């Protein structure tokens, strides 16, 4: 299987190519600046990796991209490039949630040998909010427990605990005991995004004799919202971003499950509908700030007058 994957949902651009060979797959990857900068460098990076892999667009089995959530500019760039290349080459497109790619990135980096676990993927959404999703894995099968959503940092801990309840009264979610996060410590694929939690419970029970379940939070939010997240002190927190290599790792199972779509159906995953304040909202905010500034100025003036009167009284 020959695959191209890229993710531009964050400030980091990630591109990777997989070429199958008789002795196993070979990989090429590129890292660069993402966001708005990705629009000027993504295609050049893709062309360079395909040249190194000696592949043409027509040789690809699918073009995979991180569909979001994330930077609106980055998502539009990735989606438009994926659609354009797929139309021209006549190959299908595989949209992969950037949060799912983040979960796989964290697992591959911190727990490659673990057979079961759960990752809560968190990306900074700016505006004092985070994108969040919960994914569990048993063997090579990932399951979406909580679909991507938008939360305030203070909401994440309670929202994460609710994933345990989604599995039923027996609380078989990896890393949870009696519905609460289990002991952990800090460290420096998916065959259908909407599988029923019951299926995951069966898979986990089948592997209970293996290594202890691994439970972690992963993302780029810990340095930004560390105090507001209120994560358990002993929780594993992995600093990570979605990577194209992780998309390649989840892609074969997704393709086998029929997740590829024609180019016109490959769309970004927008979790937030609003990215800017309206003119009216900005005016109200400006007026409120002006009102606060006026009150503060009046208060300061009153203090000065009071101090002056006191000084005059003391002098007499």
Regions found by a protein language model. Name each.
Residues 33-41, 72, 76, 80, ...:
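Residues at secondary-structure transition points
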Residues 52-58, 86-96, 114:
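Phosphate-handling active-site elements
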Residues 223-224, 237-316:
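Acyltransferase
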């Amino acid at each position: 299987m020959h695959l191209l994957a890229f993710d531009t949902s964050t400030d980091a651009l990630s591109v990777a190519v997989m070429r199958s060979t008789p002795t196993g797959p070979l990989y090429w990857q590129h890292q660069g600046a993402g966001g708005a900068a990705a629009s000027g460098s993504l295609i050049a990076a893709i062309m360079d990796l395909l040249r190194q892999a000696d592949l043409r667009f027509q040789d690809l089995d699918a073009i995979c991209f991180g569909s979001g959530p994330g930077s609106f500019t980055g998502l539009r760039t990735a989606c438009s490039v994926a659609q354009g290349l797929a139309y021209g080459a006549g190959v299908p497109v595989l949209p992969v949630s950037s949060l799912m790619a983040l979960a796989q990135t964290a697992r591959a980096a911190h727990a490659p040998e673990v057979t079961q676990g759960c990752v809560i993927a968190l990306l900074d959404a700016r505006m004092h909010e985070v994108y969040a999703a919960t994914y569990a894995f048993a063997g090579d099968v990932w399951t979406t427990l909580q679909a991507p959503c938008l939360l305030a940092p203070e909401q994440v801990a309670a929202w994460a605990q609710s994933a345990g309840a989604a599995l039923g009264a027996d609380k078989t979610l990896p890393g949870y005991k009696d519905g609460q996060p289990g002991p952990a410590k800090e460290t420096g694929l998916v065959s259908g995004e909407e599988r029923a939690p019951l299926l995951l419970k069966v898979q986990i029970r089948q592997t209970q004799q293996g290594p202890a379940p691994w439970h972690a939070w992963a993302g780029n939010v810990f340095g930004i919202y560390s105090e507001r997240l209120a994560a358990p002190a002993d929780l594993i927190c992995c600093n990570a971003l979605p990577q194209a290599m992780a998309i390649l790792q989840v892609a074969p199972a997704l393709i086998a499950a029929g997740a590829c779509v024609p180019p016109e159906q490959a769309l970004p995953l927008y979790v937030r509908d609003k990215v800017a304040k309206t003119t009216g909202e900005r005016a109200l905010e400006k007026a409120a700030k002006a009102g606060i500034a006026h009150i503060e100025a009046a208060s300061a003036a009153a203090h000065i007058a009071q101090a002056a009167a006191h000084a005059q009284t003391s002098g007499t």
